[in-house]
A protein has these predicted regions:
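Short aromatic-acidic-glycine turn motif
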Residues: 162-165, 285-295
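Solvent-exposed, glycine/polar-rich loop segments of beta-barrel outer-membrane systems
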Residues: 294-303
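Surface-exposed beta-loop interaction hotspot
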Residues: 218, 224-233
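Short beta-strands and strand-coil junctions in structured, solvent-facing domains, enriched
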Residues: 150, 199-200, 274-277, 288
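N-terminal secretory signal peptides
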Residues: 1-12, 16-27, 36
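Extracellular/periplasmic metallocenter environments
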Residues: 141-143, 147-221, 302-347
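N-terminal, post-signal-peptide metal-ligating segments of extracellular/periplasmic oxidoreductases
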Residues: 23-25, 29, 33-151, 160-162, ...
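Short acidic, flexible loop segments centered on an aromatic residue
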Residues: 156-159, 273, 280-287
Length: 347
């Protein structure tokens, strides 16, 4: 039984689940909330006691918010995904670089919190799909195979011919399509399915980041990819779980390791459905922000950035002090439901 059948709003669900969790109640309606380890609404005392007392896993750092247990990281590991880039198979044709990628759409179960499985549609069996990467001016060839029971496509943000737009050329189950276009403009982009109902095809997981480097390159940095997403686990048209790279609170349990003083570059993409905006906030630090990454000079120096759906950009910063530093959505509900993590800065 889902929340819509019970006539329960998302916020009613959130309020009730804390009480039910304390009483040991389980079930599909309460499973996501219970896995996220929430208790009652008043976390004030825990919050004050928790700060400055983070353990190595970061779980004591914020009043007990976090998951109970861990997901099966052999299925999908957000920590590995952070620094994985799919450059494709590179060859030279007619004096220019050609990159060929292979993507497939298929139905998979994704673990978004410990024991909470979500029936997803995914590119190459993972949510988000692989982070595609190329250099400005490369010729890209993407072989797409549909291994699902529904028609799907790939729509790439960027420049390409009309026939490569992934809107009208539906790929039927068991069929394939080859997208071919030049890698431009440089920047931080995304790709996603564009079959109607569009909301369903995106929120079920058919999306990924798409990075094009400028011809002259960028300054060397520790590069990360963070795709901000959410999951409607009871199918009521509202998210119960929020995350960076799919798994709630993953980077609170497994902090992102950074080196003191080293330049960090994060490619941030927002694909959140059902909510108008998302956000990214860094504690004890500011970052240079490059909207869509299509300019080589930052537009602002800030510690909080708002993102509409499909909006993306590049954040650059370094830390002057070692230790654990929080980052999270500055929409409090999102942070409490999984979109929260830690940077572990080491000398």
């Amino acid at each position: 039984m889902d929340g819509s059948q019970l006539g329960v709003s998302r916020r009613d669900f959130l309020r009730a689940a804390g009480v039910a969790g304390a009483l040991g109640v389980s079930g599909s309606l309460l499973g996501a909330r219970a896995a996220l380890g929430h208790g009652g609404e008043d976390h004030g005392a825990d919050h004050k006691a928790g700060h400055g007392a983070a353990d190595s896993g970061g779980m004591a750092a914020h009043g007990g918010n976090g998951t109970v247990g861990d997901v099966d990281l052999s299925r999908f590991d957000p920590s590995k995904f952070l620094r994985e880039f799919y450059w494709g198979e590179e060859r030279t044709e007619g004096g220019r670089t050609v990159r060929e990628y292979e993507l497939s759409a298929e139905a998979v179960e994704v673990e978004v919190a410990p024991g909470v499985m979500y029936p997803a549609w995914a590119y190459n069996g993972q949510v988000p799909g692989p982070t595609l990467r190329a250099r400005e001016g490369d010729l890209l060839r993407v072989v797409f195979r549909n291994r699902d029971a529904h028609p799907h496509t790939i729509h790439f943000h960027g420049f390409h011919p009309a026939g490569m737009d992934g809107v009208f050329e539906l790929v039927a189950p068991g069929q394939e399509f080859v997208y071919e276009f030049d890698a431009e403009p440089f920047g931080c982009h995304l790709y996603h399915c564009h079959v109607m109902p569009l909301k369903k095809h995106i929120e079920k997981g058919l999306y990924g980041a798409f990075v094009i480097d400028p011809r002259e390159g960028r300054e060397e940095a520790d590069e990360l990819v963070m795709v901000m997403n959410g999951f409607d686990t009871n199918f009521d048209g509202a998210n119960e779980v929020y995350a960076v790279n799919t798994v709630a609170f993953h980077h609170q349990r497994h902090p992102v390791e950074l080196k003191l003083g080293e330049l960090v570059r994060i490619y941030v993409v927002n694909v959140l459905e059902f909510d108008f905006v998302n956000s990214f906030h860094t504690h004890a630090n500011f970052f240079d922000y490059y909207p869509t990454g299509t300019r080589l000079e930052p537009s602002e120096f800030t510690d909080t950035k708002m993102f509409a759906q499909g909006e993306r950009g590049i954040m650059e910063f370094s830390y002057d002090f070692p230790g654990l530093f929080m980052f999270h959505a500055h929409v409090s509900e999102f942070a409490e439901l999984g979109w929260m993590g830690l940077f572990d800065v080491k000398e």
